[in-house]
Structures are given as structure tokens and as C-alpha cells.
Amino acid sequence: MEFAENRYSRAHEILFDGGLRVMGSSSPLNVPPPMSVPAYMDPEEALVASVSSCHMLVFLYLASKAGLVVDAYRDQAAGYMEENEAGKMAFTRIVLRPAIAFSGPRLPTATEFDVLHKKAHENCYIANSLKAEIRIEPERISGLRSEGHGRPEYMS
């Protein structure tokens, strides 16, 4: 009877290639707990994370090809939903705010840094698949280091 009354759990498991299991749920902003689980990934978060991850991976590839060393990459991405022209809720804007630290004998110029992000955006097939405006607001910083792992840290 709970299902017919729309009081069922939205918790579910998402299985990825390679065996990764991620717990998913509707957003608690859309469906209140206990029918949703706030600690689980919701589709809105997954979409923004996919755009962020795609941009990061293309950026790292391009930086590596250019002979640059990226020590850390962290993105504080955000998605914005509004009513679209058809009166339906949709992502209208996704903003990526990557903070990137470089080291090594060659550091990118400001122009090269901007071009890397432009090319990363142009070659991100996830971003190319969406109608939402995608804005990149990168920051080149120093002092961003990994959390003591002894290896670079990439987080989107």
C-alpha cells in the first residue's frame, strides 16, 4: 500500500563497470526523508559531477601533453535548475570552479591556462551533450597540495 500512496523508498544501488557500487536516491529537496536518503548520491549531483569529472580528465590529459605537471585539481562545481521554455524543471546552468596547482620546470602562462580550459571544455563530450550553459571559472593557485599521500590529488 505504501507504493500506491507514493511513500516508498527511493534508495537504490547503481552498479558500474569494474564492480563499483554507489548508493543512489532522490534528492531530499525533491522527496523528503525517509523516502529519500540524504547521504546517497542523487541524479542531480551525479550530473554535475559527471560534467566536472569529464572537464578535469580532459584538462589533465591536455596539461600532460603540454609537458605540465598538475599537483592538485579540486573543483567546487554547482548546478542550477530553473523552469525551461516548456515550463519544465531543467538544469539551465552548471558552473565549474576548478582550483589547480602546478609544479615542475615549466608552468603555464595565463593565456595557456585559459586555452587549456577552453580546449578541455570543447572536448568534453558530456558537456557537449547537454543543453545547459556550462561556465568555467578556473583558478590557478599555489600551495594546494595532496593530503600527504605522496602523490597528486585530483578531486572533482
Task: List the model feature ranges, each with a label.
Residues M1-A49, L57-S156:
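Extended beta-strand/beta-hairpin segments
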